[in-house]
Amino acid sequence: MSLSSWRQFQLFENIPIRDPNFGGDSLLYSDPTLCAATIVDPQTLIIAVNSNIIKVVKLNQSQVIHEFQSFPHDFQITFLKVINGEFLVALAESIGKPSLIRVYKLEKLPNREQLYHSQVELKNGNNTYPISVVSISNDLSCIVVGFINGKIILIRGDISRDRGSQQRIIYEDPSKEPITALFLNNDATACFAATTSRILLFNTTGRNRGRPSLVLNSKNGLDLNCGSFNPATNEFICCLSNFIEFFSSSGKKHQFAFDLSLRKRIFCVDKDHILIVTEETGVPTTSISVNELSPTIINRIFIIDAKNKIISLNFVVSSAIIDIFSTSQSGKNITYLLTSEGVMHRITPKSLENQINIIIQKELYPFALQLAKQHSLSPLDVQEIHKKYGDYLFKKGLRKEATDQYIQCLDVVETSEIISKFGVKEVPDPESMRNLADYLWSLIKNSISQRDHVTLLLIVLIKLKDVEGIDTFIQHFDRKGIWNEGVVMDDMDDVTFFYSDNDFFDLDLILELMKESDFKRLSYRLAKKYSKDSLIIVDILLNLLHNPVKAIKYIKSLPIDETLRCLVTYSKKLLEESPNETNALLIEVFTGKFKPSTFEVDLDRRDTTGDFSENIRTVFYSYKTFFNYMNSNGTSDAMSESSEASHEHEEPTYHPPKPSIVFSSFVTKPFEFVVFLEACLACYQQYEGFDEDRQVILTTLYDLYLNLAQNDVPERIDDWRSRATGVLRESNKLVYSAASNNTSKRVDNSIMLLISHMDQSSASAKDKTKIDIASFANDNPEMDLLSTFRAMTLNEEPSTCLKFLEKYGTEEPKLLQVALSYFVSNKLIFKEMGGNEVLKEKVLRPIIEGERMPLLDIIKALSRTNVAHFGLIQDIIIDHVKTEDTEIKRNEKLIESYDKELKEKNKKLKNTINSDQPLHVPLKNQTCFMCRLTLDIPVVFFKCGHIYHQHCLNEEEDTLESERKLFKCPKCLVDLETSNKLFEAQHEVVEKNDLLNFALNSEEGSRDRFKVITEFLGRGAISYSDITI
């Protein structure tokens, strides 16, 4: 491969540094006597000048900081090397004398020739052949020296500690070809050697009997300086005319073709880069005579990247290369080229960022990505390269390839910008949409998508008719919004999804688009997995897939509240499509027997269950026949015998809802409505529901029966009327039961009575004016008189209502109140019932005498309309005022007498309890109240007026004063104990609030709480006296 075919970049920086003392007296590395050089660190250079003088040059100071004579005058230094930054190794030769290797410690360099750390004298006879190459191990334990006569000497020993060494000849070339390359591997167990015709491998740890362990290349050898060693890979690099070969310590070889016919020197820069020096011939530009024209030799410097097959640096040096050496700083390799003109070229790799920018400028993005990967560039920087590459490809019109690059840089690219490129700026052709879909897929799979991204992806998939893509989305995108590589099957039972606030995409919009694209089954699967609203799934099953049976099965699998919600919304539609199955489910829900079932529906499998038998729908006229048929045919899980048996003795887990919420669904289904209402009524007693709700069912069922009696076939008219009569009788019983039970609310069935009166086939409708009230009452002994009267006010004559009032007014207390409001509601009604006299006699007089209404309520009732005049109640008001005046006077007299009596008792009590005033006790002609004998001292006088002999009384010790005698009046003892009991009772009333609460909440107390409160106040509930009687 020719060099011209390799891509070239300037990825290294070359800085020529001329000797700052060039042309002066104290030359540094431009000294013409310079014979060897080595580097310690980027700031310290060691050179050998004048054959045997070693100088330490500080490059940053441009001065020699130390120098000394290292060898005798007849020796010349030909080799310098720094080992591990600790030792300096110098090799010097002298014709006719053994060559010397001296080791110095860098921290203790000598000042004169005789001082050194250790020395090795090469045993090479009279040393008539000069040394060509030297290699030293990193620990100074092994040194190999090659000569131009083909001899190799191996030196082993503890040289770093100056403990002696041994040396032996490991090879002598039979053809006396010079040793052109010699390198020890990293652990000094093997030595690579090369002559001008062969490449050899020696084992340094054993006896090789003067023969190589392995001949690596028997056909080609190396020129001097055309071999190097790569410590990073532990490989020997051989630069041949057409190849560059790499050998490992085991002899394995790999190579690549490279045209280096004018090679001159090779040096390993780092793991992947090799510096090569080649010669080029140029024509001088001086204006001298033609005869004096001669070719000019110049050196071209290449740094090749053996890994990526590129040229990383290319420049020309017009002078000879004296030596090449390297060091490192901050992890960066620094290579130095020392030339004969006193210029030292400092070669360093450019920063990775600069290298990549140089490559990007040449639009070689794949190589830039490759280089970034090799050097472990940060992920964000790599993504920036992908972004630039994507922009480049997009401009070139390679949309698919650009999309692939944008997918690789999701963290640095502006998502809206990419979407705009493929969706807005571009014509929405299928290819652009597919590219946009690929990009959106990558957002989702990397969990950086937002709600709009997921929505847009589904829209694109729908537009592309990509059924497989939508199916993949449903299978792998779970209910937590996370993409999974495997198919997600276990999150459908995760109920926490329904209580979360997750909203991954616009489900309503996607379902609408699927509906327009006729993706029926996919829309169901999508809604089943991601919809939190069961109504959406039912709508798809019912209206899109037209599968009411499966819709009912799905509704059965929901909790009771969701089931009820679906039934309220779709029961009308379900009753039209599948009436019996729907009715069975409604009965189960509204009778408290519903329990959710499992739902595993295969949309591809035909469901054979349902309401169809030989394409004819069965119609039922009662709940009993419906229940028997469903059991016998096994068409409903809800009504099966096993289900009925399991629910027979089982308490409901929820309170059945009011059936009235689905009444509107049965508008066109009267027979199904009959079955539903009868089922609800049959199970009503089991759940102790409200009587008002039961009355609603009775009223609705009654009206339904009467309507069917008018509109159904003649064969069933009598049955409907018979059922209506039974429902009316049951309603009257309910009204009577509620009226007799004081704890429950009253039940109003007036609407049923109104329906009965309005029914065209009832007896009352045929002759309204001849209604026989007595007969009606006899037929309905448990009827609600108040509801009946209200119903009569709507359909009967006022005179008929008055007759009803005369007959039942004394039985129902509120009947007179309702009648009074009715008779004065309209002037025509007032006139027809008889006017003022009849109202006074038949209505007002019974109210006043029976005290059914306060006078104020009577006045309010009459004043609501302008029918009644003041003269109607004038006499009543006058009589009331007189009665009240008489009552007031009587109460005033009672107050005066009570006040006088209270004052007398207070005075007497005050005198009695006053112990400080002396009390005069008359003893003359007094007898003892106990023995009835004449009194003689000592006596005991009580303030109640009773007096006794002291010996006639029983003595008791005072609990407060032990020395004081305590006596109690025998005659007043009973009254005293009674007073004490009353006093204790008052204390108990004050301290025990639960007594008051119990009294207020009792049946009697709840009727008149004011009476309970006043009674407790009278018993001293607020305050009490501490006076001891």
UniProtKB/Swiss-Prot annotation:
CDD domains: RING-H2_Vps11. A zinc finger (RING-type) spans 928-973. It catalyses: S-ubiquitinyl-[E2 ubiquitin-conjugating enzyme]-L-cysteine + [acceptor protein]-L-lysine = [E2 ubiquitin-conjugating enzyme]-L-cysteine + N(6)-ubiquitinyl-[acceptor protein]-L-lysine. Keywords: Membrane, Metal-binding, Protein transport, Transferase, Transport, Ubl conjugation pathway, Vacuole, Zinc, Zinc-finger. It is found in: Vacuole membrane. SUPFAM superfamilies: RING/U-box, WD40 repeat-like. One of its GO terms (cellular component) is CORVET complex. PROSITE patterns: CHCR, ZF_RING_2. One of its GO terms (molecular function) is zinc ion binding. InterPro entries: Clathrin_H-chain/VPS_repeat, VPS11, VPS11_C, WD40/YVTN_repeat-like_dom_sf, WD40_repeat_dom_sf, Znf_PHD, Znf_RING, Znf_RING/FYVE/PHD. It is an enzyme of class 2 (transferase). Residues 637-656 are annotated as: Disordered. Its EC number is 2.3.2.27. It holds the Pfam family VPS11_C. Its main location: membrane. Residues 644-653 have a biased composition (Basic and acidic residues). GO terms for biological process: endosome organization; Golgi to endosome transport; histone catabolic process; intracellular protein transport; late endosome to vacuole transport; organelle fusion; regulation of SNARE complex assembly; regulation of vacuole fusion, non-autophagic. The keyword Membrane applies. It is a peripheral membrane protein. CHCR repeats lie at residues 406-583. Belongs to the VPS11 family. Present with 1200 molecules/cell in log phase SD medium. Required for vacuolar biogenesis and for trafficking of hydrolase precursors to the vacuole. Mediates transport at the vacuolar membrane where it may be responsible for tethering transport vesicles on the target membranes. It is required for gluconeogenic growth of yeast. Acts as a component of the HOPS complex that acts during the docking stage of vacuole fusion. HOPS is an effector for the vacuolar Rab GTPase YPT7 and is required for vacuolar SNARE complex assembly. It remains bound to SNARE complexes after vacuole fusion. Component of the homotypic vacuole fusion and vacuole protein sorting (HOPS) complex, which is composed of a core of the 4 class C Vps proteins PEP5/VPS11, PEP3/VPS18, VPS16, VPS33 associated to VAM6/VPS39 and VPS41/VAM2. HOPS associates with phosphoinositides and the PX domain of VAM7. Component of the class C core vacuole/endosome tethering (CORVET) complex, which is composed of a core of the 4 class C Vps proteins PEP5/VPS11, PEP3/VPS18, VPS16, VPS33 associated to VPS3/PEP6 and VPS8. Interacts with PEP3, PEP7 and VAM7. This is E3 ubiquitin-protein ligase PEP5. It comes from Saccharomyces cerevisiae (strain ATCC 204508 / S288c). The gene is PEP5.
